[in-house]
Amino acid sequence: MYYSLVRKALFRLDPERAHDFTFRQLKRLSHSPFQFLIQQSLPAKPVSCMGLSFKNPLGLAAGLDKNGDCIDALGAMGFGFIEVGTVTPRAQVGNDKPRLFRLVEAEGLINRMGFNNLGVDNLIENVKQSQYGGVLGINIGKNKDTPVEQGKDDYLICMEKVYPYAGYIAINISSPNTPGLRTLQYGEALDDLLSAIKNKQLELQGKYQKYVPVAVKIAPDLTHEELIQVADSLVRHHIDGVIATNTTLDKSLVSGLDHCNEAGGLSGRPVQSKSTQIIRQLNEELKGALPIIGVGGIDSLTAAREKMDAGASLIQVYSGFIYHGPALIKSIINHI
């Protein structure tokens, strides 16, 4: 009930200003006498996935808490896991503003943020200070000014730094807002990247005497043939999981709505069926070889169940959380 009032006020602000304001307040509430305002006591619905134990199958997708500023506050709301990032080796400002747009009628968002973040070292300091007891995923990417041909180096730098602190590491090669990034999803470039990542993972396993699983985040805009090739590469390189999907570039889904022609990736309800279709196809190709984390347009218990019925072992929310607030977490976890 209270979130509908909060949302009404926040939606009067520019989307990015609303996000920044909300995060400042969440940070203040965390570990304060007023944390009860965001705390939700939810039943345990344990899931084992990628060799990890999750208290429930619902997580927060990357992109909302890029710098790990509000891990504990978000954790208090009942998520089974939280994915922070995307983070890059060096801090970067991202693309020019405005770069985030609401499509309220469709409960969608278009963003062209461009991996704005304070860098991997800042994220690690925030993770160290966190008291969150759930599984923490850390999503990593490449800096905009790193040539795509050398992008692999950025992922390896980030892996080296986050490995001791991550429950799992997510490799983001599917954001549409970093020029050339999505080319890493194809053919030789993908094989080269996955080979380097697997080798680094095994090296770090030896160094730290613990195995941190790696999941690759893919786009919803892959053709069926491209998806078959991606699935084959993931299996051949013994990747631990796949996150499906990132945002779509297909704006036909929101044709005629305000902001529908803005450049960037579309998320929220409009991408729901597209991402579910990718999950279903992936599930058919992978045949259980590795688990799928389903994300894209989950805004209700029904949408969450659709993702899991399509083959997802875990699910994540982002836009749906912005539109529906903590009640969405409660509804899904209570009844999933």
UniProtKB/Swiss-Prot annotation:
InterPro entries: Aldolase_TIM (IPR013785), DHO_dehydrogenase (IPR050074), Dihydroorotate_DH_1_2 (IPR012135), Dihydroorotate_DH_2 (IPR005719), Dihydroorotate_DH_cat (IPR005720), Dihydroorotate_DH_CS (IPR001295)
Pfam assignment, any one: DHO_dh
Pathway: Pyrimidine metabolism; UMP biosynthesis via de novo pathway; orotate from (S)-dihydroorotate (quinone route): step 1/1
EC primary class: oxidoreductase
Named cofactor requirement(s): FMN
GO BP term (any one): 'de novo' pyrimidine nucleobase biosynthetic process
UniProt membrane topology term: Peripheral membrane protein
Gene3D superfamilies according to UniProt: Aldolase class I
Localization, UniProt: Cell membrane
Coiled-coil positions: none
Keyword Translocase: no
UniProt key word NAD: no
Keywords: Cell membrane, Flavoprotein, FMN, Membrane, Oxidoreductase, Pyrimidine biosynthesis
Catalytic activity: (S)-dihydroorotate + a quinone = orotate + a quinol
Chain positions recorded as FMN binding sites: 62-66, 86, 139, 172, 217, 245, 268, 297, 318-319
Family: Belongs to the dihydroorotate dehydrogenase family. Type 2 subfamily.
Cross-referenced HAMAP family: DHO_dh_type2
Quaternary structure and interacting proteins, as annotated: Monomer.
Protein name: Dihydroorotate dehydrogenase (quinone)
Organism, scientific name: Proteus mirabilis (strain HI4320)
Gene symbol of the encoding locus: pyrD
